[in-house]
A protein has these predicted regions:
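Conserved PRPP/pyrophosphate-binding segment of the phosphoribosyltransferase/PRPP-pathway fold
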Residues: 1-141, 147-194
């Protein structure tokens, strides 16, 4: 996450990264994201569990960033959900894979600038009808965090202090080229991603 992005006020409180996204990690991360290399999710998940252990120890649920159904159909898997399941297998909290949904298809964020990324995901997520995050500490899991726009929008929807909020959220980290998860704790003040 760039310095300018990290200095913005957020609806979430902390982030953890397992890998820095650079020329060395790019192949691994993009292999999971776009190359059907789902076998690396296990290693990333173990790294995420270890790196985010302080956050995960207080979490009730892992919520992977959802894909729109059309992208899920094309890709055949949600890489954030695979990471969340791997964290769970390493001793992490329960995974709520279908509790947050992507209401509309959004263009991929990769080539967008910070402001365009925020606009792109604004209003894209919603809490699945019949699900409640009330009283639960949630860690949002994503595969890559660049500006934090996607996690910010998920956190905004989940955070009870926002108009769109739906429950108490615990925070964790994110997985970028192998990062940890993120979350939001209603009892905690928003802060910088670390």
């Amino acid at each position: 996450m760039c310095g300018a992005c990290a200095s913005e006020r957020r609806s979430w409180d902390r982030a953890r990264a397992v890998l820095r996204y650079d020329k060395h990690s790019r192949h691994l991360v993009l292999g999971l994201k776009h190359g059907d290399r789902t076998h690396v999710a296990g290693a990333f998940g173990r790294w995420m569990h270890r790196t985010g252990s302080d956050v995960l120890a207080r979490a009730d649920l892992l919520v992977p960033v959802p894909l729109h159904w059309t992208r899920l159909f094309q890709r055949r898997y949600n890489q954030a959900a695979l990471l969340a399941q791997a964290i769970r297998s390493a001793g992490g909290p329960e995974v709520a894979a279908d509790w947050l949904v992507r209401r509309r298809r959004t263009p991929m964020q990769g080539r967008l600038g910070p402001a365009a990324r925020e606009r792109n995901v604004r209003g894209a997520f919603a809490i699945q009808p019949g699900r409640s995050f009330a009283g639960r500490r949630v860690v949002v899991i994503d595969d890559v965090m660049t500006t934090g726009a996607t996690v910010e929008e998920c956190a905004r929807v989940l955070n009870p202090r926002t108009k769109a909020g739906g429950g108490r959220i615990g925070r964790g980290s994110d997985i970028g080229p192998g990062v940890a998860g993120r979350g939001i704790a209603a009892a905690q003040r928003p802060g910088l991603a670390l």
